[in-house]
Amino acid sequence: AVPRFVSILNREAEISIHLERPSVDQLVTRKLTDYRLALYASRAYLDRHPPIEKREDLAAHAWIDYVDDLLFSQELKLLSSFCRNPKVVFHSTSVIAQHQAARSGLGIAVLPCFMAAGDPGLVPLLPGEGIERSYWISSRRELHKSVRLRVLWDYVVELCAHEQGLLLGESS
């Protein structure tokens, strides 16, 4: 599956959440939240492979990653932050499929902490090593004054602020 884009400029949606800050004048945009990604693998995978104690150990392991040719954002180019020339054994455009591949023991995945930290089927690797990224929220300028839109906007912003620990991998 390839992520489907909707255009708030073409009125396909009223609010959009992005991996990168949109640079369109017709939009009201603000940073929604920071979030953290980290390395995870299943206990079964770790039991079958050499131990991972430092970054240099990662080169000997199997990896799970996005399909490079189908990346819709450079923010998803994550593996190079951890390993040069990784041996990728599973590619998917879906972070959910990557999560399941890691749970099933295929290899190491870079996953959002809010998705993986509370999963008993995954073990976090190299504590303290991770990547921080941001989500951005936007709406069309002419709709931003709408009470209905602002109620939802404010709710999403408040929810992310309340769940900051989860988003940054500090709690699960």
What is the role of each PLM region?
Residues A1, D65, N85-S94:
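Short beta-strand-to-loop elements that line the ligand-binding cleft
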Residues A1-D25, S172:
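Central regulatory/effector-binding core of bacterial HTH transcription factors
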Residues R11-S16, L37, A102-I108:
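Alpha-to-beta junction loops
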Residues E20, R43, P112-F114:
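Short secondary-structure boundary segments
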Residues D25-I64:
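Flexible hinge/capping segments at coil-to-helix
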Residues E56, C113, G118-G121, G128-S172:
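C-terminal effector-binding regulatory domain of bacterial HTH transcription factors
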Residues A59-S81:
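Secondary-structure junction motif
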Residues Q98-G121:
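A ligand-binding cleft/hinge motif common to bilobed small-molecule-binding domains
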